[in-house]
Amino acid sequence: MFRLTAKIEIRSAKTWVFDKVASVEITRDIETLTDTCVLQLPKKVKWQGESTLPIKRGDEVTVWLGYDGDLQFAFRGFITTLGLKTPTTITCEDYMFRLKQREAKKLTYKDATIGQILKDQKLGIGYKVFGEQSIGQYRVTADTLSALLGQLKDHAGVRSFIRIEDDEPVLYSGVLFERGKSPKQVFATGLNLIDDTQLKVQNAADVKIKVKAVSLMPNNKKIRVEVGDTDGE
């Protein structure tokens, strides 16, 4: 039987490492830009004699998960909120948390590309463009880099997400389909979907049906009723 194992590392004034956790919930969704992780620590966590919670918003968190000690990297991000109750609940966001704090440069383009916009913004992390396209005239009006990515999504259908590669964050941005070209569905009509040798003639008189119903009364007494054909299914 496999045993779930985990390792949680929190870098604050000190580095805290936990090999046990009550629960971990990681959510990845390119529609929302930001991956999230919610950790619930065990009830009896000891903070080495600290009188107050020694971690805070903005501390880096790394999560590894696996079975029987075979751990795989699962998430890296930053604390956004800390629960006050016991057990401690920690909510984290990936590196998009940092991009929410960096100001976007207000620039104007006559014929912008995704790559050019990202290059000009000096993101502070690596980036890769998939499905590079020209998005025409464009003006950056967003206040933060994260808001800019959201603006690109709404304006040109550009999806963005962050992944960790070689221990470093990398922003992926691009379009899933070419602009102005919707995926086409082709339907064929007049075709048999089932081999006619599999079809069988079935008369209503040959179909045997039996229905069983059980009702639980307020006094916990059960009433059973069967209707239909005695040899029905």
Residue ranges and their predicted role:
Residues P54-K56, Q72, L107-G115, Y138-S146:
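Solvent-exposed, acidic/flexible segments
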Residues F2, P87-I90, D94-L99, V129-T197, ...:
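Short beta-strand-centered interaction patches in the first periplasmic/extracellular domains
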Residues M1-L99, I194:
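Assembly/oligomerization scaffold segments
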Residues D111-D120, D143-A156, K208, V214:
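Polar, S/T/G-rich
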Residues A13, I164-D166, M217:
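Short acidic-glycine loop/turn motifs at beta-strand connectors
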Residues E50, Q101-A104, S182-F187, V225:
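Short, charged, solvent-exposed linker or helix-capping segments at domain edges/interfaces
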Residues V201-E233:
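Charged, gly/pro-rich, cysteine-poor intrinsically disordered low-complexity regions
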Residues T36, F97-K105, G115-V140:
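N-terminal export/assembly leaders
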